[in-house]
Amino acid sequence: MLLTTAACASSLLNRSEPDKSSSQGHQTLTGQSALGDWTSDAPGVRRRVTVADLPRPYQTRSVDNGAHLVPRPEGAWPKVPAGFKVEQFITDLDNPREIVTAPNGDLFIAESGPGRIRVLRGRSAKGGPEVNTVFASGLRQPFGIAFYPPGPSPEFVYIANTDSVVRYPYRKGDLSASGAQQSVVKALPGGGRLRGGGHWTRDLRFRADGQKMYVSVGSFTNDYENPNAPEDHRADILEFNPDGSQERIYAAGIRNAVGLAIHPVTGDLWCSVNERDALGDNLVPDYITRVKEGGFYGWPWFYMGGTQDPRHPGEHPELKNKVLTPDVLLESHYASLCITFYNGSSFPKEFKNDGFASEHGSWNRARRVGYKVIRVPTKRGVPTGEFEDFMTGFVTAEGDVWGRPVGVAVASDGALMVTDDASGTVWRVQHSR
């Protein structure tokens, strides 16, 4: 992980945004009230977490409390706000992770476990896809998917494996790869920048003008507890030309930026981040933020704007005042994964251009948190600092877990599509007009 980057110009999109004054009447939980668990989750509940709300390290012991997964109980169903409804679009997928919408409306899904990309097309009279097929297979833990160039007529679909970036020729409407796989970022022996181990997901997005590609690479370790660990070019967001050349670090000190997204109004790069473990139930907050070019976000020595990690006392004092505070602090251990922005037209206007992010759920906390999809309100492309429960209900009254959201995408008809790797399901959320 390097700490400096060269400057480059980023392009912004000049697009209008509707008035969101009607969404400002929500009551927001703040302070200690914002630090709850799954029993306080419900659609419409808003929270704001600040650095001042955070406890000192080790106020609670670190616990291993992973999700106890069970089949979906009879009658259990995701909960969404009044006026919305949830449908089971498809189930029995194998480890569905990221989902993206192609320009023609097809849904591309990374099934990371079996190493393939699946395509779903249309919607049948029974509510499921009309076409369900495999676009490409033989991949290595694929996660990120992006079409290039951005816009209505892409020529390639890019895939981020755990140790490389590849692409396939693509013509609008292709249901299977129409040409051979092409290497974009190679994993060279002993020097591959995207080598496996540690945090394995790699997301990728293109700048709005298509001139740059961003790839997120999580850390090898939790808090750099092993100084011999291979952390070079990890815990970073990397920037490349679309052909894989001109690699550089765009932002550093980001422990595990699982999800990347480009805001449709500003063109800003955003990320959703899994922060470090083993400091207690309410440390360190996961977060969602706009990514500042050349920015340093603290890992592993600091967190949340210059707070020293107690496992690295006195290390790198010269960096303390350079650590950026993220835009939206979530609860600790949410395991925030993918993020998208609502660019459809079927939700109420106050949702336009707001973020939706999947919270996969905790393991390092005595009381479970996460296991839901949240809304991230924005105003003219700037996050308000709050987040709101949107899709909950994946935890039983006994604390067992039957669903874990991963991917989020806006379908061509404006529905929000959510992958769930616990049940192998894609959920479809639409507004009831």
Q: Residue spans of the language-model regions?
A:
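Beta-propeller domain segments
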Residues: Q27-A82, P154, V166, T201, ...
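Conserved beta-strand element within WD40/beta-propeller blades
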Residues: I109-A110, Y158-I159, V215, C271, ...
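Blade-loop segments of beta-propeller domains
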Residues: D92-V100, S112, R116-P150
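Surface loop/turn motifs at the tips and blade-to-blade linkers of beta-strand repeat domains
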Residues: Q88-L93, V134-R140, V184-G196, I249-G253, ...
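Asp-box/WD-like beta-propeller blade repeats and closely related beta-sheet repeat scaffolds
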Residues: E130-N132, A136-P149, E155-F156, N161-D209, ...
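Predominantly a core beta-strand signature of beta-propeller blades
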Residues: K85-V86, P129-T133, A180-V184, R234, ...
